């Protein structure tokens, strides 16, 4: 969640300062956001056939890989063009749409008898973890998308490691 909050915090600067989007910011932002709705609809169709764990793992792996690739691009090739950024934005938001609902449901699965309390605790803990990560990623914003995509790649890799650990536990 931390890099996603950092994206929300820096998106206006990215679109207006880096890509000179001007008044089109809201439209470009919305274009990327539509993919979260598409992910929810697709998830509803696939979850019974493939399961929450598998869909979450595939989405997290995809999010991590596309972010690592774009991070590498920014470091070795230079600033990506607007179209490439939009493809990444739409893709990572789609992945987030697949991940959040499934992971929250998986976390709540064994706690059905105290679901309300568990939801409140999970919400508080995820906020307490996300905000410092968001602050860290946002703090490195330097009129480049590199810190943001690096944050997604690193947090994604850490999340994949935690998913593997949780599966074995």
Give names to the regions the model predicted:
Residues 1-29, 35:
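Extracytoplasmic gate region of multi-pass secondary transporters
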Residues 21-29, 81, 85, 144:
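Juxtamembrane helix-start elements in MFS-like secondary transporters
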Residues 30, 34, 90, 120-128:
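Transmembrane alpha-helical cores of Major Facilitator Superfamily
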Residues 33-41, 131:
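Residue-level signature of mid-helix packing/kink "hotspots" within the transmembrane helices
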Residues 39-54:
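Helix-to-loop junctions at the C-terminal end of transmembrane segments
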Residues 54-103:
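C-terminal transmembrane helical hairpin of 12-TM major facilitator-type secondary transporters
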Residues 104-142, 151-152:
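A late C-terminal transmembrane helix in Major Facilitator Superfamily
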Residues 153-169:
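Multi-pass alpha-helical transporter architecture, strongest
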């Amino acid at each position: 969640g931390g890099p996603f909050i950092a994206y929300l915090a820096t998106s206006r600067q990215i679109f207006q300062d880096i890509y000179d989007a001007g008044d089109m910011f809201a439209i470009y932002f919305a274009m990327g956001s539509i993919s979260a709705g598409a992910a929810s609809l697709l998830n509803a169709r696939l979850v019974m056939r493939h399961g929450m764990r598998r869909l979450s793992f595939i989405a997290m792996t995809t999010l991590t890989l596309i972010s690592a690739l774009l991070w590498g691009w920014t470091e070795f090739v230079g600033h990506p063009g607007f179209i490439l950024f939009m493809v990444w934005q739409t893709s990572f938001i789609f992945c987030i749409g697949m991940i959040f609902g499934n992971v929250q449901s998986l976390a709540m699965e064994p706690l059905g008898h105290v679901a309300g309390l568990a939801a409140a605790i999970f919400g508080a803990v995820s906020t307490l973890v996300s905000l410092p990560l968001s602050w860290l990623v946002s703090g490195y914003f330097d009129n480049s998308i590199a810190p943001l995509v690096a944050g997604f790649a690193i947090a994604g890799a850490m999340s994949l490691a935690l998913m593997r650990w949780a599966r074995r536990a």
